[in-house]
């Protein structure tokens, strides 16, 4: 039994060390921009395999004040209307997701806020299970502890996936509309926000087999809601 205790101890030490790494990494992002994310690295590997390090993805960091208010409002309206007020998660949405997942017998809905989405994008995989969800909540707490809402939103807009190998709002603006993130119109912003649940499908039809989103209808709904969106300015 001694070896079981040893293995358990090693596991606990490993888990604690991982949390310390996440904690210190997020603290550094108060002043340093993340150079990459788990999703970016996974996409590089998917596209290029062993040529991972030389595989380009489209991404260019832009400061928060260089990003159009239209896309900020569109993303808030689409993804997390109460972003500026909640502590990183919404209990009602999580409980609703829990009930739906119990009915389906598996995780099909996450009830994720923008901060939770960022936690997943930065550090975790797209795998759906309760252990990963627990880690996501821990990272969400760390993000909200160290970073203010504007910084969280800035990192999110510069890191989120917007197509095949397309990450961040500047790359998305250039890729789809041949413009900069600072010049996105209301219509363009609404279309980009509509793409967020299924960015690869929005980019290329070959990824749409299991996607059931009418991007045009969703964009029109987002455009109508943008005026009520509250930004972390």
UniProtKB/Swiss-Prot annotation:
GO CC terms of this entry: peptidoglycan-based cell wall; plasma membrane
Superkingdom classification of source: Bacteria
Compartment(s): Cell inner membrane
Residue stretches spanning the membrane: 4-24
Membrane topology, record value: Single-pass membrane protein
GO molecular function: pentosyltransferase activity; peptidoglycan glycosyltransferase activity
HAMAP family the UniProt entry points to: PGT_MtgA
Protein name, per record: Biosynthetic peptidoglycan transglycosylase
